Regions:
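A structural signal for multi-pass alpha-helical bundles of membrane permease subunits
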Residues: 1-184
């Protein structure tokens, strides 16, 4: 599409800016629109993630530049494939490893999110993720000076979903990581 390179460069530029510099500004924005605290505190955690990040766009663009050649696209067009068919029959199946790798990266990032969860869900412990609950549990157990076995068990239990997800999708995860290696 026209302007694709400018759009891509703007996305790459946003990756150069530190996320911490925008944390407070983002928080103020979400406070002003009423998305902080209670069940609405989940919205700033979910809605921005639906649109991907600059890193995701860069990753997928790099993958598709190397995996989807112009010859394949031209051959599909000659065979009568329209844009929708080209996307669903060729681009999506070719991009499955990269898309699944991005899903895994996003899931692990959201699962391990601590500061954003604490910032937006501070007053509703029923909505906390496992990492916030684990932090509070270890804080409570530290008061008694001991309970190291319980802390380690809680940390291990919090890692189990990620370990199971990794082993279940290891093939796609490794393929997605190897995407950046390039083809010689």
């Amino acid at each position: 599409f026209p302007g694709r390179k400018i759009f891509f460069l703007a996305n790459v530029f946003t990756m150069m800016l530190p996320l911490g510099a925008f944390g407070f500004v983002g928080y103020l924005f979400y406070v002003n629109i009423g998305w902080v605290g209670g069940a609405r505190g989940l919205l700033p955690l979910i809605i921005p993630g639906l649109f991907g990040s600059a890193g995701t766009i860069f990753f997928l663009r790099t993958y598709y530049d190397s995996a989807l050649s112009n010859e394949v696209v031209d051959a599909a067009k000659i065979d009568g494939a329209g844009t929708v068919r080209l996307f669903f029959s060729i681009a999506l199946p070719l991009g499955k490893p990269a898309i699944l790798a991005q899903f895994l990266f996003a899931f692990v990032g959201g699962y391990n999110s601590y500061s954003a969860q604490l910032m937006y869900l501070y007053n509703d412990k029923s909505l906390w993720n496992l990492q916030l609950a684990l932090s509070e549990l270890t804080g409570m157990l530290s008061e008694g000076n001991g309970y190291n076995n319980a802390k380690c068990a809680a940390a291990f239990i919090s890692m189990l979903p990620l370990i199971l997800l990794y082993f279940g999708m290891q093939k796609y995860f490794i393929e997605g990581i190897n995407i950046g290696g390039g083809k010689e």
